[in-house]
Amino acid sequence: MSSPNAILHELLNLDEIMLTNGAEVSRVEETLNRMGHAYGASQMNVFAITSSIVVTMVFPEGEEYTQTRRITTPAGTDFFKLEQANALSRQCCATPLSLTDLKDEINKISKIKPAPYTIYLGSMLGAGGFSVFFGGTILDGAIAVIFAFLLCFLQRHLNSICSNTFILQFFCSLFIGTGICITAFFFPVIHVDKVMIGDIMLLIPGILMTNSIRDILIGDTISGIMRLVESLLWAGALACGFMCAIWFVGGVL
């Protein structure tokens, strides 16, 4: 029989993937509960928040195994990876995998990364569409598309350098906002506000805020408040970045 500690370690690996890719806290706890029982536990005590998971497996013989996982990976949204993690959890609940197979499957899921072109294409289409949707012209949408490409490029290459999400978002919004304002100075025909709105929509933590409200409503108050505060600080960093860009360009040019 595989070591319960080793199994618990892999279960935490799977739940960390779920928590950092858009899963609700209640879903993370439920997954650990179900998988723990599938692997022979008679009782599962699980406590999860956005930054930590604590779980105790109690077996029929009276043995207890407890592990804690500190979540340091910034929260993101990857529904494909989340779907794969959910599918694996259902498979294990129906027919538990061996420790080796479980570890291999989790490693495969953790290595899944979206193709860069899909991120660039989606961001460009989204920024251009939102810019036109909020009243901009086709030219405004085209400018928003260009800066959406630059925004994705910045995020992709600065993410490994800057581990602080708020600072990263601030500098990205500052750079993009400055670029848009300078472009509008030389090409007065474009509408700065419409172009900015299109690119801001790529940065707003909408899913994070939605999940925070959902967590609060279903009783996960601590997790909900943590996510809500994080999303508000994130939005504040974006607002400060674009505000500084407008102030800087307006003062210099």
Model segments located where?
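Alpha-helical transmembrane segments and their cytosolic membrane-interface
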Residues: P74-A127, S131-D140, E230-A239, G250
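Generic secondary-structure signature for well-ordered alpha-helical cores
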Residues: T20, H37-A41, R90, A94, ...
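Generic detector of multi-pass transmembrane helix bundles and their immediately adjacent loops
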Residues: F185-L253
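Soluble N-terminal domains of membrane-associated systems
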Residues: M1-L97
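Core alpha-helical transmembrane segments of integral membrane proteins
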Residues: K113-F186
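C-terminal ends of transmembrane helices
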Residues: E105-K108, L151-C162, T210-S223
